[in-house]
């Protein structure tokens, strides 16, 4: 799990269990509210057999996030997706 701080948001990479393994995700939460975090699937929704594999993919994706918009959308580096 990795954490990245932005101007108004915080993002955390993680793996979440799914029926047949794990998915890589990035969760984003606005700092000044109690709103629920938004979860974004990364790695094109690929399923991994091991949680550690999904976490590596999620951490790699998080390094390519430049900023989070005011609406909580991920803003990626150029050519990242």
Where are these regions (language model features)?
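Short arginine-rich
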Residues: 59-72
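Short, intrinsically disordered, low-complexity terminal segments
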Residues: 8, 54-55
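Solvent-exposed strand-loop boundary residues in beta-sheet-rich modules
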Residues: 32-34
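RNase H-like nuclease fold core
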Residues: 24-27, 36
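Short, charged, intrinsically disordered terminal tails
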Residues: 70-81
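Helix-coil modules at protein/domain termini and other flexible surface or pore-lining loops
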Residues: 3-4, 45-46, 56, 81
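Short N-terminal "domain-start" leader segments
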Residues: 2-25
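A short, exposed loop/beta-hairpin motif centered on an aromatic-Gly-Thr core
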Residues: 36-53
